[in-house]
Amino acid sequence: MKKALFSLIFCMLLAMPAARARENSLFGPLQRGERAALLMVHFGTSHDDTRERTIDAVNARAREAFPDLEVREAWTSPTIIRILKKRGIVRQTPDEVLQQLRKEGYTHIVIQATLLLEGAETESLRHVVARQKGFKEVRIGKPLLYSVKDCRQVTEILATRHVDAVGRRNHVVFVGHGSYTPATATYSQLDHLFTADGHPNCHVATIEGYPTLLTLKERLKSLKARRVRLVPLLFVAGDHARNDIAGEWKEALEKEGLQVDCRLEGLGEIPEIQDLYISHIRSAEPWHLTD
């Protein structure tokens, strides 16, 4: 009995150093008392159906990919947060969730936003992070369309997904939101890459940026297009997809004599796009925190 008890105590002593330094999939060894979390940041949506297929889906993929991290979410749109609050649904902002994580004792945080561009929203998120105190390390992942490699991967995924809609006079148009920052040039880059990489019947246009609906109509006319499929170039196929793309844009192109169908699928619904966000989490870089 004494021998068995001695063996048990000996084994426990051997295990103690391992408890002091637990290996984490992103941060490496974590010391006793250190805890790691992943914060997924979304613009948000008031539509339950598309939320389940996009935001909830990518959150689930993150939990599956990083089982040793506590996964939380935050939303950035004040308007959507207010709408949901009236329904009795509470969504917190990045600042609120980060403060809560700090109170709960989390020391290492990685943040991944489901944004497309390196623009105003990413800059706003960095300002929120810069105000945080008490964390030992914070990492921020890149948006979906950060590099040329990212853009090429996305165009290939989309072209493959909609190959059924492409033909000699059949075209696919991916409609993005657009931006008032220099990041809006990314849409023109995507448009160019479709053609450069062998998908000349795939195009990109934007609701509030460039290329515009007017430039799109001129291009389709010059190409003698007959049929067009409109697809949201948006993480969530919400109000813009339903009102602008399937409404105003569809009507405008039909007035040009085109046969138009809409595939209202958000980027967040596509497994390969979800995989790209997961890869950006893995490659997230440390963000300098001031004391």
Model segments located where?
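Extended amphipathic ligand-handling, pore-lining, and cofactor/metal-binding catalytic surfaces
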Residues: 22-291
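Bacterial N-terminal signal peptides
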Residues: 7-15
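Sec/Tat signal peptide C-region and signal peptidase I cleavage site
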Residues: 17-21
